Amino acid sequence: GGGAGGLGGDKTSNFGEPGKGGDGRSSSITGSSITYAGGGGGGQFYDDSVGAVLSGGVGGTGCGGDGGIMPPSGQVGFNRYAVAGTAGLGGGGGGGGAYFAGGNGGSGVVIITFPDTFPDAQAVVTGGGRVFKFSAGGTRTYVFYGDGTLEFQ
């Protein structure tokens, strides 16, 4: 799957390595460089008659999940389940291999920055989540994680 900063990769052949997830996009809005929204890696189906690599596609930078695989008949120990994208960074889930489900996408984040010359507001969260507030370099920043609603009063 594609990410915020780039397209996902193509598989190398019909039975080759599955596509890599697209890279996410880096941002320093919180004061630290963090890469968000990487794409999930492609899933893999193993064909006993042809043979194939034994892994799913790698997730993109920005916490995209790795793809899963349908393993060879009767064999265990392979990463058969796709990996979810990382919570709070918005990464895409990895693709499922054959009969297995794909990974869930990671929850996102809302980041709001404005000049500290504006009046301060109280951030109120309803329905689940948390908000962090900090000031630096003449700005005020709110970082919201969760699945609820953020309102300023």
Cite the ranges covered by each PLM segment.
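Low-complexity, glycine/proline-biased repetitive segments and flexible coils/loops
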Residues: G1-Q153
